[in-house]
Every structure is written in structure tokens, then in C-alpha cells.
């Protein structure tokens, strides 16, 4: 086991004889066989589980709210002619399985329920990120994954008990999910070499899109065949099954990992030798408040997640209402933008690291360029959606393109906090999550209000507002965004309240 002096000696040796480049080449050949890439894949699985639990209510709520079928419809099959056909009994059994409680929830109530996941998340990210940064993310993330998965199993019972209990359960579940989404970035402070930071974080982050894809693809089918409660039972169970995988395989520091090779450990440690990654107990709050580069990231987070949460919550509803798709087809069509986005997130991370490692573009140029691409093009596409609603193929093409291009932000402003203040990654990620969840609490509620006022022009107003918010955040980030470590984030500088 390496000690502090040993690590420093190794750094000195490699710095003097140039072996860092050799170690880098050896580790790069391993690709996804390296421990750090294996860690990214495990985090991808965790994000997959969390986002299936976030999205399952969005895909199930059209089945939970049945405003079109008359009350007597479940008994309509009794009017059929009597037959001994096996197909008839199979169909009857299928309809019986699909029968589940339907609730009389207005669009406003649905918007509140969909937003409730974020209501309890305003204060949780900051302490979660701070604790993960100081004590390590292993147990913070693992506990959050288990709590969120366990509570998912009880959503059908909460819905039967009443809207209030369902909202409370989703609030608690949102707090647990914040522990996962916030704490995981503290791991990359000690595991991600600067030249691989974008690809490792995007591989892990792509689990969010992959989870959304799977739950949208399978959710509608599950609702139609065995009933909407099983959407929560199945994906909650998957999350619980992931927990035993997390605890024995995850370590906060590569120095302590029992399976990592000496070459990979040396490469990671030496790559981060010039970067102050030691967690800071004392927070330079006053300097953070005055930091325009930090505010640029905060504003960008709020604006980009405004659009993200709107799309995530209302894509199934838009497809089912505007395209008149049934529940199964709505789930399949809603899944397409997310699977393409999952692929593009990883490709964007690889491209960003390629441009940086080959010194084609500076880091700040990469961050701003990828953010601009990920904001401008999707905004234009979404604003154009109401004018192509008569064409189903064009509508789906626009939705897929919007999701694919917006994924470039994951290698832009959304990862920029790792560049400017690695010492305070956990705390800053928690602070950023607060802004993201504020957007997540407001945007679906606002969308539900617009849609309830006018179903046709309501969607147009939703897309116009989302585009305006997104572009305003981009302008602020382009003006004030930076990628160098800030003075207040260096060990020598401490400013206290």
C-alpha cells in the first residue's frame, strides 16, 4: 500500500525521467479494461437505475390517469359473443392483468406530482456533496441508491393512499437520488486524469439516457400487459439488486483499490499530481459568491436542466397526445431520443478529450463550443416542433436530433466545475444540483399550466419558454465562463465569512 511520501517520490521520479508519458500510453492501450473505465461503467449502471426510477412515473402516468375511458369500459368484454376460443381467453386474461387503478388527476396535479421529486432536493445536494467530498462517495452513493430503489417499490401503494402520500414519498425519494447524483462526482476527483475527464464522466453520465431509454421502451408494454404498478416493482427491484455490486467493487481512491495495476495507479496519481485534489474542510464562501465563472456554471445548469426536466417529464405525454399514439407505441417512440442521446454523450466526451489531448483547442474553448452546440441547435429544433406536428416522422426526427445534440453540454458547462475547483467538487456539485432541481421543480409545473390552458398553443409556449431560458443561460456562460483553477480553489487561498 502506497503512502504519502512514496507517492511524492514516485511523482518526482516520473517528472524527472519522463516516464509519465510511457505510463499514459500503457494505460491508454487498456481502454475499457482499465479499472477507471470499469468504475465508469459501474457508475453508468447506478445512473441507469436512478433514472429509470425518475422516469417510470412519467411513462406510467398516462395509464394511471384515464380521462377518456368511461367507467363501464373494463366490463365491456362481457358484451362479446360467447366463444370457447383460446385466443379469447388469452385476451381476456391480458385485459384483466392490465386492469389497475385509474385516478382523476388534472394536468395541474400531474405536473405537481411529476415535479415533487425535486421539491425535497433543494437542501439535500449541498450536505450530500460536502460529506461525499470529505469522507468519500462510496457509502453516500450506495445508501442513496438503496433508499431510492426501495421506495420505488411502494409507489403503487402510495398512489392508492392518496396524492399527498405519493408526493411525500417522491420527495424523500428525490433526496435519496440526490445523494447518488451528487456524490459520484467526488470519485472522479481522484480517479479521472485531466485528459480523460470528459470521457469518464460522460460514460458514467450516459446511464441517465440509457435508463430513460429502457424505461420508456419497456414501460408502455408493461402497463398494457401486466399493469402500471409493475413498472415500479421491476425497476425498483433492479436498483435494489445493484446495491450488492456497488459496495465491494467501489473505492474512493485508486491508491487503496486492491485490483488496480501498478502502472494504472502510477498514471492516475501522476496525472493529478499538479492538481490540488485534497478535500477542503473550510469553504471559501465569500470568494465563491463573488466568482463570476462559478455563477456562469450555476446559471447554465439551471437553464439547461429546465429544458432537460421538461423533456424528460413530458415527452411521453407529448407523443401520446399530439401524435395520438397508444401507450405501448408512445413508450417506444419516447425512447428513441434517449438512446441516441446516450450514444452521443459518450461520443461527445471522446471528442472533447481528443481535441484537448491533441492540443487542437484549449480547454475553455472546448467547454464553450460544446455548450453552444448543445444549446442553440436543440432550442431551434424544439421551437420548430409545433409547425411539424402534422408529420409524425418529422416530429420524431426533431425530438431525436434535439436529444442527440443537447448531449454535447455534458462535455461543456455541465462538467466545467471539475476544472475550476477540483478541491470542492462535492460541495459544488451539490450546489449545482440545487439549481438543477429548482429548475426541475418549476419547469414541469409551468409546462402543465400552459398545457392545461390550451392543448395546442400550450405546447408551443412550453417550447418557446424552454428555448428562451436555455439561450439566456448560454449567453451568460459564454461571457463569464472559465476553465482554469480559480484562486479561491487553491490550497493557499482561504476566504471565510
UniProtKB/Swiss-Prot annotation:
What is the catalytic activity of this protein? 3 Na(+)(out) + phosphate(out) = 3 Na(+)(in) + phosphate(in); urate(out) + n chloride(in) = urate(in) + n chloride(out); L-thyroxine(out) = L-thyroxine(in); 3,3',5-triiodo-L-thyronine(out) = 3,3',5-triiodo-L-thyronine(in)
Record flagged with keyword Lipid metabolism: no
Among its keywords, does the record have Glycoprotein?
Answer: yes
Q: What's the reported outcome of changing residue 90 to A?
A: Loss of glycosylation and significant reduction in the transport of thyroid hormones T3 and T4
Gene Ontology CC terms, in alphabetical order:
apical plasma membrane; brush border membrane; membrane; plasma membrane
Q: Which GO terms describe its biological process?
A: phosphate-containing compound metabolic process; sodium ion transport; sodium-dependent phosphate transport
Q: How does it sit in the membrane?
A: Multi-pass membrane protein
Q: What is its main location?
A: membrane
Superkingdom of origin organism? Eukaryota
Residues that span the membrane, as ranges: 149-169, 171-191, 203-223, 230-250, 292-312, 332-352, 368-388, 398-418, 431-451, 461-481
Keywords, comma-separated and alphabetical: Cell membrane, Glycoprotein, Ion transport, Membrane, Sodium, Sodium transport, Symport, Transmembrane, Transmembrane helix, Transport
SUPFAM superfamilies according to UniProt: MFS general substrate transporter
What tissue specificity is annotated for this entry?
Answer: Abundantly expressed in pancreas, liver, colon and small intestine, less in kidney. Not detected in the adrenal glands, brain, placenta, heart, testis, skeletal muscle, and lungs.
- Its signal peptide is none
Question: Which molecular function terms from Gene Ontology are attached?
Answer: sodium:phosphate symporter activity; thyroid hormone transmembrane transporter activity; transmembrane transporter activity; urate transmembrane transporter activity
**UniProt-annotated location(s):** Apical cell membrane
Q: Give the positions annotated as glycosylation sites.
A: 47, 56, 66, 75, 90
Q: What does this protein do?
A: Acts as a membrane potential-dependent organic anion transporter, the transport requires a low concentration of chloride ions. Mediates chloride-dependent transport of urate. Mediates sodium-independent high affinity transport of thyroid hormones including L-thyroxine (T4) and 3,3',5-triiodo-L-thyronine (T3). Can actively transport inorganic phosphate into cells via Na(+) cotransport.
Family of the protein in this entry:
Belongs to the major facilitator superfamily. Sodium/anion cotransporter family.
UniProt cross-references to PANTHER family, sorted A to Z: SMALL INTESTINE URATE EXPORTER-RELATED, SOLUTE CARRIER FAMILY 17
Name this protein carries in UniProt: Probable small intestine urate exporter
Q: What is the source species?
A: Homo sapiens (Human)
Its gene is SLC17A4
